[in-house]
């Protein structure tokens, strides 16, 4: 019969192994600049030979230039991830600037691979996230300039500028070199090919004609 100490050791090893699998591994060298032309397929990118690495691999110019806000939802997300800065490969971090028109919003979405921490630079934002089933609890807050809010990894969240006259600006840091974004309405009603209207009518408990109308809309992407 196994001793209590052996059982405890086995449990601790199992816990440590699970935690190691559940998160990105730590870098094993100073940096691993993404080699986007490498034929090697890995989870992320293969490393560029260090002798070819320059400071430009860790640099992106003029991120804070004001981008467009002309889409229907009234916001623009400018993401700086490993695709823009190859030096972010294996470092587990990226950053985004979000510009909101008056009454603009960053609609409900998730980041499947990252936690987000948002800081308001200008204006006011109403923000929130919803927990998983079965409770679906909404945690929301009105943020002003300098305020910070956290959106846990994978949970549906949003930001809305309630001011009808003034724009707002925020910066978000995300805990992945490639956090991904799934905008809920776009994914459900704008998938290609479309989800069966019978499936969605049943799921949302509405008439099929309502689903057909929603699927006929142009679901604009505000992430660039």
From Swiss-Prot:
Location of this chain's protein in the cell: Secreted, Extracellular space, Apoplast
Keywords of the record: Apoplast, Disulfide bond, Glycoprotein, Manganese, Metal-binding, Secreted, Signal
Domain Cupin type-1: 62-212
Binding of Mn(2+), residues: 109, 111, 116, 157
Signal peptide: 1-22
Molecular function as annotated in GO: manganese ion binding
Primary location group: secreted
SUPFAM superfamilies: RmlC-like cupins (SSF51182)
Miscellaneous field: Member of the 12 germin-like protein gene cluster located on chromosome 8 in the major-effect quantitative trait loci (QTL) for fungal blast resistance. Partial suppression of the 12 germin-like protein genes increases susceptibility to the fungal pathogens causing rice blast and sheath blight diseases.
Family: Belongs to the germin family.
Known role: Plays a role in broad-spectrum disease resistance. Probably has no oxalate oxidase activity even if the active site is conserved.
Subunit-structure text: Oligomer (believed to be a pentamer but probably hexamer).
Name of this chain's protein: Germin-like protein 8-8
Biological source species: Oryza sativa subsp. japonica (Rice)
